Amino acid sequence: MDYNKTSRTLAGIFLTGLCIALLAVSTSRTNGPERKSAERFDKAMLQAEIRAYILENPDIIFEAAAIVRQREAEEESRRDVDLVKEYWDELQNDGRSYVGGNPEGDITLVEFLDYRCGYCRKAFEEVEMLLEDDGNIRFIIKEFPILGEASIIASQFAIAVRNIHGADSYKSIHDTLMTFTGEPTPEVLVEIATTFGLEPTPIFEEMMSQTVMDEINENRALGQKMQISGTPTFVFGEALLRGYLPLDAMREVAKEQRGS
């Protein structure tokens, strides 16, 4: 931010406020018709002064708007930190979600994702690179299908594989779905399962179970409580990051969260 411009903007706002205060004091000392006449005169004079100042310094309108936006962003950031703290246990220790990377890492990255989300796919390789290069990040995946029926089917399939075959098989399926751009039809899912030596029938049965849908619904409920409406959304340490983040930016967040 340009602090000289900010100072000028705040000075303008201060002067305007001072004018209003002085005029209020002056009019308060008069009574009856004289006061009403003074108020009309003072109001007209004030309006003229403000108009003249703005015409001479039109940039202050944009600068003031920028200050408001910055304050709103700072307030949103504070709210996001509070949300992460409030729902920390659900984010970190729900007892179901896949935990990878370095499970004993000194910092945790949680990703809410949808297999049909283009930006999730874009982030996929960069998240994998981050985990590999850093080596000390605990990674949690929250299945968060929000882009229609195909998204739900893909998440059901991945969760069912995890429930039956464990975390390693889940990660293989997850990686495949993140790079798959077609429709998750039954034929496609059979092919994916058999590629990894998995029997499709039990997986399809598990997909329809209440356990799988409960997990998806609980992730959605958590997202709603945390005001998450899009994917990808990351919780990196105590930082809530809404939307795609490039690799270099994620590395910077890791440094900030570690205090280095």
Model-derived segments and their meaning:
Residues 145-231, 235-260:
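Cysteine-centric redox/oxidoreductase cores and disulfide-bonded domains
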Residues 3-149, 205-208, 213-230, 259-260:
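Extracytoplasmic thiol/disulfide redox context detector
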